[in-house]
């Protein structure tokens, strides 16, 4: 009977043979499934003794784990690894390789299992006790401290942001200045505007020139009659050029509107009855807010377009003795030699034509083609 002794202080399992060794012609029963290696045996052999493989990447690679232990822990791990290799050598070629019988063994001569019966070795009789003691030692039952891999926490760095704390940098500029921001009404979008709002450019001193009628001039030394130029007061920086009786009595800076301020009806207000810009809208919300081009409210007109101010009309008696009156045409209106055409137009628009004053743009209602077919249809009557 053989006696086996395990040296606890070393890293090698010593098997002491007795005087009665097993016979050399030991042939196991090939029909016994315990003689053939299983898939678990292959995995266990790889884990215990990976050096005997051919290194063809069929087994798991021998990688170094992240956060490897210190030198003392590495020594303990190395000792446990040596014991594992010793046990693996104890079971070297103690089973037949089933992959070699199938012709698919990748390890060839480096296989841990026997490819022939002649290579087969008998395991020690007490191999179960040796394996159990090794497993108990690995689990920490015999006082050997288990090696616990402590993962070192990774230090995280926050990438600094280049965005400044000002409100200007919060907007995504498109590289252009906001046009509405520099007007007197200001930008209706405020901080949500995607264009640049430059306060320094807005506060720069500039001279505003308005071309319009007289009545809008304001200045410290402006006179009455003709165009008024504001230049008497030191604080005035508005120059108004216009024609008309303007009385300059203001002493401060006059806020001027654009020349096309509220000269048209707001489409949004006219269709929906609501405008998001409100009083800051550049278009008129109703006929009461409608202005002339250059400034000034438009005078209310009647249903037929007659101006309520009677002194704006100049009438003369018809030279042919007709009872109706005709108005003097404006200098820019061409005259036609056809008397019937003039008579028809004069009878139909006697009250709508207004003499044009300097600096005032008149608004007249166009009533469509009035008997325009007679111009092209008279020649038919002449032929007949």
Swiss-Prot record:
| Gene Ontology biological process | regulation of DNA-templated transcription
Gene3D superfamilies annotated for this entry?
Zinc finger, CCCH-type
Annotated PROSITE patterns:
ZF_C3H1 (PS50103)
**Is Manganese among the key words of this record?**
no
Taxonomic superkingdom: Eukaryota
Which sequence ranges does the entry mark as zinc finger (C3H1-type)? 91-118, 172-200, 260-288
> Gly residues bias located where?
212-231
Which InterPro entries is this protein grouped with?
ZFP36-like, Znf-CCCH_4, Znf_CCCH, Znf_CCCH_sf
Q: Which GO terms describe its molecular function?
A: DNA-binding transcription factor activity; mRNA binding; transcription cis-regulatory region binding; zinc ion binding
Q: Which UniProt keywords apply?
A: DNA-binding, Metal-binding, Repeat, Zinc, Zinc-finger
Q: Where is the composition biased (Polar residues)?
A: 50-60, 309-329
Q: Does the keyword DNA-binding apply?
A: yes
Region (Disordered) residue spans:
1-32, 46-81, 211-231, 299-335
Cite the record's Low complexity compositional bias ranges.
Answer: 70-81
Q: Locate the coiled-coil region(s) and give their ranges.
A: none
Q: What is this protein called?
A: Zinc finger CCCH domain-containing protein 12
Instruction: Please report the organism this UniProt entry assigns to the protein.
Output: Arabidopsis thaliana (Mouse-ear cress)
């Amino acid at each position: 009977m053989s006696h086996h002794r395990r040296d606890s202080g070393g890293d090698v399992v010593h098997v002491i043979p007795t005087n009665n060794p097993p016979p050399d012609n030991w042939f196991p029963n090939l029909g016994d499934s315990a003689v053939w290696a299983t898939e678990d045996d292959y995995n266990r052999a790889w884990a215990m003794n990976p050096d005997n493989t051919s290194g063809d990447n069929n087994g798991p690679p021998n990688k170094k784990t992240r956060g490897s232990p210190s030198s003392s822990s590495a020594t303990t791990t190395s000792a446990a690894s040596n014991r594992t290799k010793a046990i693996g050598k104890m079971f070297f070629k103690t089973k037949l390789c089933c992959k070699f019988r199938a012709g698919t063994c990748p390890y060839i001569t480096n296989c841990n299992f026997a490819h022939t019966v002649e290579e087969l070795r008998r395991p020690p009789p007490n191999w179960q006790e040796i394996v159990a003691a090794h497993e108990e030692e690995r689990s920490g039952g015999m006082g050997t401290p288990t090696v616990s891999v402590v993962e070192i926490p990774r230090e995280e760095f926050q990438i600094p942001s280049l965005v400044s704390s000002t409100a200007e940098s919060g907007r995504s500029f498109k590289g252009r200045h906001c046009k509405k921001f520099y007007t007197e009404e200001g930008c209706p979008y405020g901080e949500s505007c995607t264009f640049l709002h430059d306060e320094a450019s807005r506060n720069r001193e500039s001279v505003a020139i308005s071309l319009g009628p007289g009545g809008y001039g304001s200045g410290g030394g402006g006179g009455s009659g003709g165009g008024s130029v504001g230049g008497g007061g030191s604080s005035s920086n508005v120059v108004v050029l216009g024609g008309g009786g303007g009385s300059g009595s203001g002493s401060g800076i006059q806020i001027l509107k654009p020349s096309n301020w509220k000269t048209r009806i707001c489409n949004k207000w006219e269709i929906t009855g609501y405008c998001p810009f409100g009083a800051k809208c550049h278009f008129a919300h109703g006929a009461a807010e409608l202005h002339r081009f250059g400034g000034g409210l438009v005078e209310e007109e009647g249903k037929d377009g007659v101006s309520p101010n009677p002194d704006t009309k100049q009438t003369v008696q018809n030279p042919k003795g007709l009872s109706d009156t005709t108005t003097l045409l404006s200098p820019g209106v061409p005259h036609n030699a056809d008397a019937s055409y003039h008579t028809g137009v004069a009878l139909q628009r006697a009250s709508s034509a207004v003499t044009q004053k300097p600096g005032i743009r008149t608004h007249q209602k166009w009533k469509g083609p009035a008997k325009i077919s007679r111009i092209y249809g008279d020649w038919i009557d002449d032929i007949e």
